[in-house]
């Protein structure tokens, strides 16, 4: 999959941020209680479901899914976060870019929590098609984006924000994926509750 130099520069800058700040990022996320959303996703899956944690960060969600008995593949683009997540979860976390996902109908669920938001809309559209291909029929995707209409660099990373309406517009021609639930939450990290997030659950039909 080919992307222009501008897009790759944005990806490189975001990965550089996470590699340089991996330890502080991990410290700020692994202890955050996120079970309400995790369980909302798991309720959609069978007990023997195969999950892809797509952009696993420090491994908080992978560790929770494993503790609940699910089979999990965990990937991230940051070499340093992969190292931290491997140690934290006890499984091998694979370093890869979102654009490199090439599985076919392998997963019952794809968990993309605050991860694919670092892609531009152009990149996101192609990656979304790869996610769809990697998902089994009737499979589920959970994903989240910062709530808003901004797209560009912010705090050293690239972000694409969505509202409920702009995400519907973005996905309207992706036949076969249906938004089943969407809701807005505050940030669960201490001192950041005023930041709003768009949460989405979609099913492959």
Task: Please annotate each region the language model reported.
Residues 2-105, 119-126, 130, 140-205:
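Class I (Rossmann-like) S-adenosyl-L-methionine-dependent methyltransferase catalytic domain
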Residues 108:
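Conserved acidic residues
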Residues 111-112:
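A conserved beta-strand element that flanks and buttresses the S-adenosyl-L-methionine
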Residues 115:
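Hydrophobic adenine-recognition pocket in adenosine-nucleotide-binding enzymes
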């Amino acid at each position: 999959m080919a992307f222009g130099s501008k897009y790759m520069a944005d990806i490189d800058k975001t990965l550089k941020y996470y590699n340089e700040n991996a330890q502080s990022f991990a410290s700020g996320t692994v202890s955050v209680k996120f079970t309400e959303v995790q369980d909302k996703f798991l309720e959609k899956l069978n007990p023997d479901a195969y999950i892809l944690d797509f952009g696993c960060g420090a491994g908080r969600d992978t560790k929770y899914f494993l503790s609940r008995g699910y089979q999990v593949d965990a990937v991230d683009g940051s070499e340093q976060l992969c190292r931290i997540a491997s140690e934290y979860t006890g499984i091998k976390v694979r370093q890869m870019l979102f654009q490199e996902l090439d599985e076919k109908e392998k997963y019952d669920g794809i968990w993309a929590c605050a991860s694919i938001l670092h892609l531009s809309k152009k990149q996101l559209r192609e990656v979304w098609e790869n996610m769809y291909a990697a998902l089994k029929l009737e499979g589920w995707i959970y994903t989240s984006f910062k709530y808003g209409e901004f797209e560009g660099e912010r705090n050293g990373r690239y972000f694409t924000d969505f509202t409920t309406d702009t995400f519907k517009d973005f996905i309207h021609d992706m036949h076969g994926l249906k938004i089943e639930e969407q809701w807005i939450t505050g940030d669960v990290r201490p001192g950041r509750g005023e930041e709003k997030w768009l949460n989405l659950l979609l099913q492959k039909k």
